[in-house]
């Protein structure tokens, strides 16, 4: 880590007026500050830089003792973190005083999660959320450990269920099909084939078996459904012309195949259709969104959602707003999969390989919506992008939150803000952010906290801070109530009407 990298990091802090996902500032004028939480969070996410010797307003204070601070940092990483963390530590002269910077590298997946040893894994493991270090949830810890240990959650048996809860006719057809396609299977009896295929375990249906062949999976897991809602406006809670909160509402249940069909039916029923009649009088109906893109997204939500014990009470959500469709499924991205590499990596690891295999083996290669989507495995996201482009619509947005993954499709009513706003924040605010700028500014006619703004928008605080608040403060459209302490827990924001 060279001095230029440190100086650029300080410039970023001052420009944005806040810490970032990758940069943390610590005051160290009066002694060695607490930083095990930041070391843990950077190690568990994408790494980062800690700069010691800056005030809350990012002015240079210097450190109490350069040599002692470096020694304690090294000891903390080596002796107090599990696994031990190697820190790249660099003292630097800046604005007449000495600072100390520590670069924390992301740990390999095989070594995560990193935690403060004294706190133990459940109290000492942290993750980076926007500009803050947050204690990891039991689910976040489990997600990293289960990947590391290769835990097949889709093969866990459903103890209260029996083989009789599976659709016998479909099981018979499946066994007949795999026997014809896999001669080595033909020598086994049906029960053994079901076990080898992952349909059952110790004569109990597995999660994969239930979600693919179950008579009624929701009898055992009531929350494994899709909640579909058509909203009258652009935000949750916005009322329609007749005072209605929803235009349409449906709970979609069944197997993965049945839920895909039900969700697509709901989406088609609640989107606009353009009718084109050519010179010959032939009528063509063009839906508001490309059905193929939606099919890919819903299939991904069903097939790749987390089916572990930590998320079995969480359901998939489908929202149809006036300007967009949102599809939200429980579970973080699996293993090494990254949001910035979606649709570009040719090798992506699957969370539920047994569910995917059963679906592929169950259906003929040309049969139905589900098989068409499964055939596009590893190309589903490029397909979504390509289909949206064919319709002249914006690229879909992919958002990873804490314990969830969201896909957003915008229609043609998703317009950008006036030029003045979009010019001011074009390098910081994406298309979906600019659509919300006026809403945020109106809401902040009186001072609002980050939590209030995030709850109002129905988004996470880290996402709102990064995508909305930081650019608007930077451009003087929002003003802090406590400008001298940007990180204050009492901080609020209000619209600059000057």
Put a short name on every predicted segment.
Residues 1-50, 54-101, 107-110, 288, ...:
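Polybasic/polar functional segments that serve as interface/processing modules
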Residues 84-162, 313-314, 375-400, 405-406, ...:
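Intrinsically disordered, low-complexity regulatory tails
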Residues 124-312, 317-328, 334-336, 340-345, ...:
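Active-site helix-to-loop segments that bind/position phosphate- or nucleotide-bearing substrates
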Residues 289, 459-474, 487:
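Short amphipathic alpha-helical interaction segments
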Residues 325-374:
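Glycine-rich/acidic phosphate-handling loop/turn and adjacent ATP-lid/helix
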Residues 394-396, 473-484:
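A short, conserved structural fragment
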Residues 434, 480-498:
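Short, cationic-aromatic polyanion-contact patches
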Residues 445-452:
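Short capping segments at the starts of secondary-structure elements
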């Amino acid at each position: 880590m060279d001095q230029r990298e440190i100086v650029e990091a300080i410039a970023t802090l001052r420009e944005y007026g806040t810490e970032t996902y990758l940069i943390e500032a610590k005051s160290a004028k009066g002694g060695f500050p607490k930083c095990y939480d930041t070391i843990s969070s950077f190690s568990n996410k994408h790494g980062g830089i800690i700069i010691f010797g800056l005030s809350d307003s990012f002015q240079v204070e210097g450190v109490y003792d350069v040599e002692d601070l470096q020694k304690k940092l090294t000891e903390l990483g080596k002796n107090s973190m599990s696994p031990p963390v190697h820190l790249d530590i660099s003292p630097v002269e800046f604005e007449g005083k000495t600072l100390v910077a520590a670069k924390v590298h992301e740990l390999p997946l095989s070594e995560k999660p990193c935690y403060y040893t004294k706190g133990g894994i459940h109290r000492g493991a942290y993750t980076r959320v926007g500009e803050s270090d947050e204690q990891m949830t039991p689910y976040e810890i489990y997600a990293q450990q289960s990947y590391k240990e290769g835990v097949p959650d889709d093969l866990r048996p459903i103890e209260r269920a029996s083989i009789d809860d599976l659709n016998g006719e479909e099981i018979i057809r499946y066994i007949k099909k795999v026997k014809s396609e896999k001669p080595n299977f033909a020598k086994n009896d049906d029960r053994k084939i079901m076990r080898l295929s992952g349909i059952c375990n110790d004569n109990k249906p597995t999660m994969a078996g239930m979600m693919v062949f179950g008579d009624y999976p929701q009898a055992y897991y009531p929350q494994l459904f899709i909640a579909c809602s058509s909203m009258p406006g652009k935000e949750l809670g916005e009322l329609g012309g007749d005072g209605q909160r929803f235009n349409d509402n449906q709970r979609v249940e069944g197997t993965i195949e049945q839920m895909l069909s039900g969700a697509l039916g709901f989406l088609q029923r609640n989107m606009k259709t353009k009718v084109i009649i050519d010179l010959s009088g032939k009528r063509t109906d063009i839906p508001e969104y490309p059905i193929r893109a939606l099919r890919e997204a819903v299939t991904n939500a069903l097939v790749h959602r987390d089916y572990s014990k930590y998320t079995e009470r969480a359901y998939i959500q489908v929202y149809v707003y006036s300007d967009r469709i949102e599809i939200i499924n429980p579970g973080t991205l699996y293993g090494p999969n990254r949001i910035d590499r979606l649709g570009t990596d040719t090798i992506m690891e699957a969370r539920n390989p047994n569910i995917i295999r059963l679906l592929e083996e169950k259906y003929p290669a040309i049969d139905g919506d589900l098989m068409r989507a499964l055939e596009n495995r590893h190309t589903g996201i490029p397909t979504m992008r390509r289909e949206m482009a064919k319709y002249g619509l914006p690229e879909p947005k992919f958002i990873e939150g804490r314990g969830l993954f969201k896909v957003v499709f915008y229609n043609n009513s998703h317009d950008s803000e006036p030029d003045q706003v979009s010019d001011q924040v074009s390098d910081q605010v994406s298309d979906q952010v600019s659509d919300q700028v006026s809403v945020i500014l109106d809401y902040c006619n009186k001072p609002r906290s980050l939590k209030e703004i995030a709850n109002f928008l129905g988004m996470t605080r880290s996402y709102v801070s990064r995508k909305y608040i930081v650019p608007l403060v930077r451009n003087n459209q929002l003003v802090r109530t406590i400008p001298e302490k940007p990180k204050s827990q009492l901080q609020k924001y209000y619209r600059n009407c000057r």
